[in-house]
Amino acid sequence: MASTSNRNFFSSNMTQIPMDEKIRIALQFNNLSQSTKQTLTKVYCALAIGILTATVGVLFSMFIYRPGFLMTLLLVIGSAILFATTPRTQDYKTQVKRFTLFNLVTFVTGMSSSGLIELYMDINSSIVLNAFMATCGIFISFTLFSLLTNKRLYIFIGSSLASLSIGIFVLALTRLFGGYSEPLDQLFILAILASSVLFIIFDTQIMVHRIENLGEKDVLFHAFILFYDFVDLFRVILKILAKKENKNNNKSRR
């Protein structure tokens, strides 16, 4: 039934349907079971809460209290380990504990990013908001692509990520020992951006596979993985926009 609905969506008959109706049909996600859609709704609600908590962590670190680098690092690692090692049982007490730990992880991750955000705000205060909006747009776009397609691309993407990671490592070594080169630096940043996008597709499709085929409906764990995909993409876009702003400022001074 689901595959038939999906085939109908891409059939030539769909050309006669208005665009808004096509979008409505697509967003019904008929290729996914009802149980999977319910789980995904909870996952993305948890992710939204995590992003909001991280934002609070950034503001807390900027305006109230900023711990040292070592303490922040220990807090991030410690909270992540606590979250990952807490039993994934479904009883109420454990779920409350894991939800608290999940928000602690996102909060301290936000704290750890505050210094970087302040640095880029000094260049141009609009960079951070633009980077966040761009991150949301890219993340949502590739998430929808991953959910709407019937083809499970995670095996192909996994091998591509492995090759890309090796390429990024080689580029990093070249930058470290070969001196600064503008084209090489741009290639390095674009490679990291590509890997961030591929991780969104890979992790989303792996999540759907585990929910549908393995019955792994651990909402908080899936949200935890996607949260770091979002944060990594945000940091990369932030760096790209800041680099572009610096370049424009240098041109205007000449």
Curated annotation (Swiss-Prot):
GO CC terms of this entry: endoplasmic reticulum membrane; membrane
Q: What are the subcellular locations of this protein?
A: Endoplasmic reticulum membrane
Q: Where are the transmembrane segments?
A: 44-64, 67-87, 99-119, 127-147, 153-173, 188-208
Q: How does it sit in the membrane?
A: Multi-pass membrane protein
Q: Pfam families attached here?
A: Bax1-I
Q: Name one GO molecular function term.
A: calcium channel activity
**Record keywords, A-Z:** Endoplasmic reticulum, Membrane, Transmembrane, Transmembrane helix
Q: Which residue intervals are topologically Lumenal?
A: 65-66, 120-126, 174-187
Those portions of the chain lying inside the lipid bilayer but not traversing it, as listed in its UniProt record, are located at 218-238
Topological domain spans for side Cytoplasmic? 1-43, 88-98, 148-152, 209-217, 239-254
Main localisation: endoplasmic reticulum
InterPro entries xrefs: Bax_inhibitor_1-related
Domain of life of the organism encoding this protein:
Eukaryota
Family to which this protein belongs: Belongs to the BI1 family.
Q: What protein am I looking at?
A: Bax inhibitor 1 homolog
